[in-house]
Amino acid sequence: MFESTRKNIQPSDATLVITQTRGVTGSKQNHRDTLRSLGLKRIGHQVTRKADAVTVGMVNTVPHLVSVEEVNNG
């Protein structure tokens, strides 16, 4: 398991737990839209997603607003 907030996440078969760590006040509109697309609504909110290319791309768009943990499926 690792925690990351940088743009180093790669698509894989892993499951990601994505947590919103910062608010969206003052953020760009596309960053707000990306968080909503991930299903994040407020600080501290967590969602679980597969690490496919779409999810990884969205996480890499807002690394300064989220923290990511990889959960082993085994």
Curated annotation (Swiss-Prot):
InterPro entries per record: Ribo_uL30_ferredoxin-like_sf, Ribosomal_uL30_bac-type, Ribosomal_uL30_CS, Ribosomal_uL30_ferredoxin-like
One of the GO biological process terms: translation
Alphabetical UniProt keywords: Ribonucleoprotein, Ribosomal protein
Gene3D superfamilies found in the cross-reference section: Ribosomal protein L30, ferredoxin-like fold domain
GO molecular-function term, one example from the UniProt record: structural constituent of ribosome
GO cellular component labels: cytosolic large ribosomal subunit
Keyword Transport: no
Family matches, as HAMAP family: Ribosomal_uL30_B (MF_01371_B)
Family annotation (NCBIfam families): rpmD_bact
Quaternary structure and interacting proteins, as annotated: Part of the 50S ribosomal subunit.
Family statement: Belongs to the universal ribosomal protein uL30 family.
Name the record gives this protein: Large ribosomal subunit protein uL30
Gene designation: rpmD
